[in-house]
Each structure stands twice: as C-alpha cells, then as structure tokens.
C-alpha cells in the first residue's frame, strides 16, 4: 500500500465519522486532501447515493463516489471535448476491478446490516476505507493523480 492510499484511507474515515455518507466521504476525501477539483454544487450530487441510492441497497454509494472522482479527472464538459470511448474504458475497468476485489457492486451484498445500527456504521466505515484506498491505488497506477 502506498503512503498516498494510506493517507486517503485516514481522510475518508475522518469524513465518514464527521457525518458524510459513503459516497460523500469518498468525494470529500479526494477533493479536500488530493486536490480533485469538485465544487460544492457538484459535491451535492454525491448525497443521494449513500446506502445504495437512498438506502435502497442498490449500487454501492462508495463505488458511485469513486466513479465521480474518476470522471472529474478524465471526464468532459461538452461532447466535442472528448469522445466517451476515452472515458468509459477507465470507469469500466475500475468497476470490474471493484467487483473482483469486493465480490459485488451492490450495497445489499457488501453491507448486510440494518442501516444506522452499530454494526452497519462500523462495517460501512471499514469498507469505505478499503474502497478509498483501492481508488487511490488505481488512480496512482493509471497516472491520473500525482502525489
């Protein structure tokens, strides 16, 4: 594990403990401590994804937060700026690696505890930490972030 991924794991834990959900905590850690340029309006986009989209236990909110960070680094503002064929392979690769590493991309599979219980909060914090480190290592490997 790199020093950067360890630092990001610590920072996502701080964000989570301060009240951010999994998706927000990932985005906050990268915007605040890794210099990823995500403004407040864009940050708000992460709020509804916690708990697998508003506690629906669907797609993992932390995975969505990771995808938001990656998209901020390699995405586009207009269709003319960059073709999607330059963006999708990177986000797809991260998705596939995530699924292989964690066994699923679904909140209900990753977090089998009742929401807002002690077990849920403890395990979601631990999982969000692992996911944040996983993203940090991916970004370093791809040369998408310099530390």
Show where each model-derived region lies.
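C-terminal binding/interaction regions
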Residues: 86-147
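Transmembrane alpha-helix interface/packing and boundary motifs in multi-pass membrane proteins
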Residues: 48-57
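DPxDG-like acidic metal-binding loop motif
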Residues: 65-73
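Acidic-glycine-rich active-site phosphate/pyrophosphate-binding loop
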Residues: 1-3, 30-48, 101-109
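Polybasic, low-complexity association/targeting segments
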Residues: 1-18
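Conserved phosphate/anionic-ligand binding catalytic regions in large, soluble enzymes, centered on
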Residues: 56-65
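Phosphate-handling active-site elements
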Residues: 33-44, 72-90
């Amino acid at each position: 594990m790199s020093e950067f991924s360890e630092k990001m794991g610590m920072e996502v834990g701080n964000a989570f403990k301060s009240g951010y959900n999994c998706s927000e905590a990932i985005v906050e850690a990268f915007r605040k401590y890794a210099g990823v340029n995500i403004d407040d309006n864009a940050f708000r986009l992460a709020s509804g994804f916690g708990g697998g989209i508003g506690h629906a236990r669907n797609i993992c909110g932390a995975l969505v937060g990771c995808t938001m960070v990656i998209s901020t680094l390699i995405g586009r503002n207009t269709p003319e700026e960059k073709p999607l064929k330059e963006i999708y392979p990177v986000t797809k690769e991260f998705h596939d690696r995530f699924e292989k590493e964690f066994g699923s991309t679904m909140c209900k599979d990753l977090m089998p505890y009742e929401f807002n219980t002690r077990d849920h909060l403890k395990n979601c914090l631990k999982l969000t930490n692992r996911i944040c480190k996983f993203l940090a290592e991916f970004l370093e490997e791809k040369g998408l972030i310099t530390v």
